[in-house]
Every structure is written in C-alpha cells, then in structure tokens.
Amino acid sequence: VAVSIACALFNLKCKIYMGYKDIKRQSPNVFRMKLMGAEVISVRNGSGTLKDACNEALRDWSGNYQKSHYIIGTAAGPHPYPTIVKEFQKMIGEEAKKQILEQEKKLPDAIIACVGGGSNAIGIFSEFMNEKVDLIGVEPAGRGIETGKHGAPLNHGRTGIYFGMKSSLMQNQEGQIEKSWSISAGLDFPSVGPEHAWLHSINRAQYVSITDIEALEAFQILSKK
C-alpha cells in the first residue's frame, strides 16, 4: 500500500507482485493499491505466497533494471535492502520509546513483536538494542511446530543462503526450501531477516513461537481490553 501511495504521488508506474493466496487474505489492501493506480499481479507459482511473490518481483526487476526499481517491504533479501527497510521502520521504535518515556518516565522491561520476515520487529527493536530491555520476537507456529506447517526458521530451521542473504531457513535435508504456514499473510515466509538471525545467535533477542489458534485468542483478549 505504501509503495502504491508513493508511486501515485510521484506519477510513477507501480507493479505489485502478490501470491494469489495473499491476494485473497489481504483483499482490503489489494483494493487500496488498485485505487492508487497500482497493477497487482497474482503469482500462482510455488505456494502462491510471499516468497513466490518476492521471487517474481526480483525476476521482473533483473530483466528491467535499467528502467525500474525494486522495492521490498520486509527486512530480508540482499544488501542493502534489509538495511534500507530497517532505516525506515525504526521510526516505530523511536516513537514507541518517546511515548513510553513520556507516559511511564522509564523504559519498558521488554519489547515483544511478531516476526515473519521481521521488518516491524527490527524497526521497534532497533531503538532498544543498546538499552537494558529484553527483546522478544514471536514466530508463527502455524498449525503446530510438530506438523511442519509453521513459519519459525529461527528455532526450527537451519542456516543457509536464500533470497540473496545468509540467514535461518526452513529447508529439508537436501537444502530445498520448505513451504511455510501462518494464518497471517505477512508472517507466511520460510526465512527471516539476517539481523534477526544475528540477534538470535548472540542471545541479544529471544525468539518464541505461537500457533494460529493462540494468536487469535490473544487478539480477542487484547481487543476486549
């Protein structure tokens, strides 16, 4: 949506690649993008989700790099994309830190954020990395880790190369990327941004996972507060 708004503002052509499953799951956002004049391309390759859309977008860009620019919304992929995304997303952390200091006069004990590719999480973590604040990332356990239908590569994946980056991946014994699963389209990704893998490796951040059912229950509890 942000890309389509920017393109509309500067009168640029905008092509958005989305997995066909995500188009169904995010129909309100698709409507907004089309309203701004974006061309939304349905990707039916592979699992028809985020990773396949990313692959198609990169394929398009590599064949048209002289007249187009590639943009990704998650903090993953080859350098400098994770850094670019983090720099924009860290506004989340800056605003959160400012507001909690204004209201509580102290820093929080912990920061908790969902982690798919990890852009929102790295955005809020960035402002608290050098503070005495626990950082907790929550990966999607989907239908249950034991079922294999999840998106939790940090605790249940292996290190590898994917999408132009070295990070934690969901892959089989032959090194092939496995399908991820999450009720949330934004978390349905078989890898994670490399900075999260680094934070995990040095124990600066803790990463846990919850199932789709647990996430929905938490959403309902929060909505009633």
From Swiss-Prot:
It is an enzyme of class 4 (lyase). The keyword Amino-acid biosynthesis applies. It catalyses: (1S,2R)-1-C-(indol-3-yl)glycerol 3-phosphate + L-serine = D-glyceraldehyde 3-phosphate + L-tryptophan + H2O. Transmembrane segments: none annotated. One of its GO terms (molecular function) is tryptophan synthase activity. GO terms for cellular component: cytoplasm. Gene3D superfamilies: 3.40.50.1100. Its cofactor is pyridoxal 5'-phosphate. The keyword Transmembrane does not apply. Its EC number is 4.2.1.20. Keywords: Amino-acid biosynthesis, Aromatic amino acid biosynthesis, Lyase, Pyridoxal phosphate, Tryptophan biosynthesis. Pathway: Amino-acid biosynthesis; L-tryptophan biosynthesis; L-tryptophan from chorismate: step 5/5. Belongs to the TrpB family. The beta subunit is responsible for the synthesis of L-tryptophan from indole and L-serine. PANTHER family: TRYPTOPHAN SYNTHASE, TRYPTOPHAN SYNTHASE-RELATED. This is Tryptophan synthase beta chain. The lineage of its organism: Bacteria, Pseudomonadati, Pseudomonadota, Gammaproteobacteria, Enterobacterales. The gene is trpB.
